[in-house]
Amino acid sequence: SIGSKERTPELRNPKLSTGGLVESNSARPVPQVRIEIPQYISVPGTKRWLHIKGHLAYGTFTDNNWQEDFARSGNLYTKDVLYHSKSFFMKVGKKESFPLELEAGLQMAAQFGGKQYVEGQKEPIMTMPSDFMDFIRVLIPMSGSDNAMEGEQINKYGNHVGSWNIGPVS
């Protein structure tokens, strides 16, 4: 899908939770291009004992210039920050044959790219890289290129968050 769309976070029970560790419904949806398998599908050859679902998305954060309006003189704000998220979940079990089903998976999101400004100045003081290889560096978390900040050359490029989710199917 393409665009801004409200989505329920993976494995979230709306009766028990306000959100997950990686994503929640408490913020405006991020405009994105997203490829997904939203519901579990059976893996061929497993006699319906193994199912998978997941997604891969890239987008951009928007704030209707809120940061520019809110930032006090001399303070920093960032524009044109990019977004990446991905998930992969497996469900093992077959309710018709055995009463217990388990699901497990990984969910990750990252912020990267963008330009940092000082309130009152037109030119950015820092531009984070966002070429094709930077999209790959976020997809498969790896260190940044030579034009990334030093900390992101040593560690991973972008601000990554993620969670492993394991539990019985409710």
Regions found by a protein language model. Give the residues of each.
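Residues on the lipid-exposed face of transmembrane beta-strands in outer-membrane beta-barrel proteins
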Residues: S1-I2, V33-Q39, F88-K94, P168-S170
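Transmembrane beta-barrel strands of outer-membrane/channel proteins
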Residues: I2-E6, I52-T60, L102-A110
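Aromatic-lined, polymer-binding surfaces characteristic
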Residues: S4-P14, T18-Q32
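Outer-membrane beta-barrel translocator domains and adjoining extracellular loop/strand segments
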Residues: R12-G19, N64-S73, K115-G120
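Extracellular loop and loop/strand-boundary signature of outer-membrane beta-barrel proteins
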Residues: T18-E23, R72-L76, I154-Y157
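Transmembrane beta-barrel outer-membrane domains
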Residues: S24-V30, K47, K79-S85, N159-I166
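Short loop/turn motifs that connect adjacent beta-strands in outer-membrane beta-barrel proteins
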Residues: Y40-G54, K91-E103
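Long, internal scaffold/assembly segments composed of regular secondary structure
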Residues: L102-A104, F112-S170
